[in-house]
């Protein structure tokens, strides 16, 4: 089929095979002879005309992106042929088209009185956040643009700070909802929220305090049933906790452990502790506490294997009996939850410290954010596979989140203060880069929080549910964007 629209300047025509993986957007298979000067806009118009997505038909045109050999077409077809085929205009070009990912649109900002350390959008309509103010907060997205008031503010029983957070109870559970936060105090604090209704009279409380680590908690995740919690730590270990069906009546772990932080268990200190009465640790005394602890529980299993800190955890989205961990030792490891056995090992370069990990539900591929300013993809379906693709960034990546339905897009947060949305079919550059500091909603005069904490630019957390994207970090704010990503 030859395309020569009226009024267009004479141009050489190239044989193009247009195809898509979306049945609803498919056009008849044919070789289209298309002017070499055409770019994305003209190609998108052609697809919409064939599909009948025109104003005459009462339909709104759909914007499309076009990929050639796995990379987004960013110029004309002629420019691509000159660059990649040495000017060969006779061979057919296979061009895949996909619905465009629209630029994220900032909707709101919520100020937090300290650095934001963790974010979760796993429960629709709400964002769960943890901060170094030692708070866990629940924010309703519907009211975020008008008010920064949290629906619940849950204080940790320590002033050392919260490092991560997760929803524990499944979406279907509407009462006695469990949430969890990992802390610098080596513990994971699990809270029970009576209801997310603002009219609830009952107050939330800390139900469990999970012990067992010797370093700060770096990541906390929960199973889809809400019955199990897994934590990763700077001590290199991964702990599994099985929550009881009914509230217990006694503790599994004694109160007031001797030391909470790395470096406090030195030989000299242990000798002094033999001669002196045990004293409360600074930051964990009753006077500094902001709440009461829950039932103290020990781990049901400890998974060992990492030779450095555990950077992040993700529950396998295709196999509920498996979890994945990424570590500062450059490895990604798969673990069987029931036995605690290491079922898979992907060892990358030892200097490629992984700070976080997430997984695409569509194909099981893992994505890690790394200290060496890269995002790495790992194919979990091949036992001997290492890094299958690397995306370059400008600074370390402490948080990544894969799109829940698209197998190609993900979002990342970086230490340089930017949020990036990627399409792995075009891995050289991000589709969109958003700087929180340069946003119209940013307050240039806010240098410190009300409690005197100095603010910075590094982002520490990002999450994306396919419709809403949130990010936060040292700037003491949660940025909220509308972003579909399909």
Curated annotation (Swiss-Prot):
Residues 249-299 are annotated as: Disordered. The keyword rRNA processing applies. GO terms for cellular component: nucleolus; nucleoplasm; preribosome, large subunit precursor. One of its GO terms (molecular function) is ribonucleoprotein complex binding. PROSITE patterns: WD_REPEATS_1, WD_REPEATS_2, WD_REPEATS_REGION. Disulfide bonds: none annotated. It comes from the Eukaryota. Its main location: nucleus. It is found in: Nucleus, Nucleolus; Nucleus, Nucleoplasm. SMART domains: WD40. InterPro entries: NLE, WD40/YVTN_repeat-like_dom_sf, WD40_repeat_CS, WD40_repeat_dom_sf, WD40_rpt, WDR12/Ytm1. Pfam families: NLE, WD40. Residues 12-99 are annotated as: Ubiquitin-like (UBL) domain. Keywords: Nucleus, Repeat, Ribosome biogenesis, rRNA processing, WD repeat. GO terms for biological process: maturation of 5.8S rRNA from tricistronic rRNA transcript (SSU-rRNA, 5.8S rRNA, LSU-rRNA); maturation of LSU-rRNA from tricistronic rRNA transcript (SSU-rRNA, 5.8S rRNA, LSU-rRNA). WD repeats lie at residues 212-251, 305-345, 349-388, 392-432, 454-486. Component of the NOP7 complex, which is required for maturation of the 25S and 5.8S ribosomal RNAs and formation of the 60S ribosome. Component of the NOP7 complex, composed of ERB1, NOP7 and YTM1. The complex is held together by ERB1, which interacts with NOP7 via its N-terminal domain and with YTM1 via a high-affinity interaction between the seven-bladed beta-propeller domains of the 2 proteins. The NOP7 complex associates with the 66S pre-ribosome. Interacts (via UBL domain) with MDN1 (via VWFA/MIDAS domain). Belongs to the WD repeat WDR12/YTM1 family. This is Ribosome biogenesis protein YTM1.
